[in-house]
Design a protein with these regions (language model features):
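Polar, enzyme-active/binding microenvironments
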Residues: 1-171
Length: 171
């Protein structure tokens, strides 16, 4: 793995990483086993030695977040940061502890959450107004790659349909 600071890739919008959060997704189908994943990262001051861990998901399919679930040492959807950290400025390493996955590759995602919309159960309609209610009119930087990161609760089902209608104003 090549650290962001050692490659051509740069965290250009948030150079010190304030507010950036991590998640780990399967880039290819993951094999059996559910090892512990240890990620070492640099905090917003560039300090080394910050780590976060989670128990991976055995046989996860492409696109699934490996750090989610209802079991112990799972987090939805973002990995916890070390005490006092407010973001991630660089990823240093990812190490599997214990019996590694039999196969597969992962992506460590760094993202800036703009808002969270709860979907408490399948079939429940949820609407959020970002003009007249809080959080009001979050700034979306030019060139941003807007994506929706969805994780299901125990009260939702994989057969449920999710529709998203996203309107925005440009200044």
């Amino acid at each position: 793995m090549t650290a962001i600071g050692s490659s051509a890739a740069k965290v250009d919008r948030y150079p010190n990483g304030v507010g950036l959060r991590m998640f780990v997704a399967a880039d290819t189908a993951m094999g059996a086993n559910a090892p512990t994943c240890v990620i070492n990262y640099l905090d917003t001051a560039g300090g080394a030695g910050a780590t976060t861990t989670f128990t991976s998901t055995a046989s996860a399919t492409i696109g699934n977040l490996l750090n989610t679930g209802a079991a112990a040492n799972k987090y939805n959807p973002f990995l916890p940061l070390a005490a006092g950290d407010t973001g991630v400025s660089d990823i240093v390493s990812l190490v599997w502890s214990g019996t590694a996955h039999a196969s597969g590759t992962v992506v460590i995602g760094l993202c800036k959450p703009l808002w969270t919309i709860p979907v408490p159960a399948t079939g429940i309609y949820t609407k959020v107004d970002f003009v007249n209610a809080l959080p009001s009119m979050r700034k979306i930087p030019d060139g941003a790659n807007i994506q929706f990161l969805m994780f299901q609760t125990g009260a939702t089902t994989s057969a449920g349909t999710v529709w998203v209608d996203f309107d925005y104003g440009y200044n």
